[in-house]
Amino acid sequence: RTKMVTVQRATGYGWRKAITIDQIKEWVEFVHEINPDIIRMVDNCYGEFLHTYEPTQVGADIIAGSLIKNPGGGLALTGGYVTGRADLIERISYRMTCPGIGGECGLTFGQTRTMLQGLFLAPRTVNGAVKGAILCGKVFEKLGYDVCPKPEDERSDIIEAIRLGSPEAVVAFCQGIQAAAPIDSYVSPEPWDMPGYEDPVVMAAGAFVQGSSIELSADAPIREPYN
């Protein structure tokens, strides 16, 4: 009776490499062999524009992501996207609004231009984010820290994990990122019990767009292995 299986492309707070497009293709084919009717969905957050192809081009039925991450190019102020099979998009649109209207109507709050401009600029923005992640990984590796992925590894998201080893080190790192930010550099982040998280979380994001992860930011749950 399984209707859908999903996979998260990005590392998230885990200690693993992001799932590559080739691995997603293998997963899609594996699921299809078991049951061709199962919907195969990919959480594509942080992974857009890392490769020439996106998951829907290697067999995923539907993907979803956030516009304040990669595809918004740092300009989109809010929003998300879903794309994939037309019949699934229609069903999703009916759930988001109401049957019969679907995606034909809906508020954009005047954000269409910045969303489209952000999408246009996104590949270059993601390119810069990846270079920054590689540089960060190399610097901290030379300082003796364990990093994931390694600077020379293939990447499938923009996340760089650094194992800092203690709660104090995690908080100090995030406070350093915030202090060097262009916005709210006077703020000193502290862990707190954020809704939706199992552990206290500390977040540094001195970004022009609230909550943006395509700008330089750092966040972590206060739990082992403290990365």
What do the predicted segments below correspond to?
Residues R1-N127, K131, G137-F140, G144-C148:
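Conserved PLP-enzyme active-site core in the AAT-like
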Residues E141-N227:
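Conserved C-terminal alpha-helix-loop-beta "cap" of PLP-dependent enzymes
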